[in-house]
Design a protein with these regions (language model features):
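Short, charged, low-complexity amphipathic alpha-helix
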Residues: 1-10
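Amphipathic alpha-helix face/heptad-repeat signature
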Residues: 11-18, 81, 85
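Amphipathic alpha-helical interaction modules
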Residues: 13-61
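Amphipathic alpha-helical binding modules
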Residues: 58-92
Length: 92
């Protein structure tokens, strides 16, 4: 294996590790938010931060759970967050 592939493999491993850490941090937060009615500012803040990690399937599932829970409560904000996700992560 050449140095370029080695460096790329290390980078991928680091990103996967960061995603794992983010999931560990966001999972209880997502469960907490879905178990109550939080303020629009709190939900928006968490979704904005989670957006950076939505390339990770597990975090994307948490993001979607929060969006589903709050869609009827804060429809405009949730629509904005979903559109932000699409702009950032959708490749089509």
């Amino acid at each position: 294996m050449n140095k370029g592939n080695d460096d790329l493999s290390k980078l991928v491993a680091q990103i996967e590790h960061i995603n794992e850490l983010a999931y560990i941090q966001y999972k209880p937060i997502a469960y907490d938010l879905c178990g109550r009615i939080a303020s629009i500012d709190e939900v928006e803040h968490i979704l904005d931060r989670m957006l950076d990690f939505c390339g990770c399937d597990e975090i994307l599932k948490l993001f979607k759970q929060i969006c589903k829970h709050y869609y009827e409560i804060y429809p405009e904000m949730i629509a904005y967050e979903i559109n932000s996700y699409r702009e950032f992560w959708d490749n089509e």
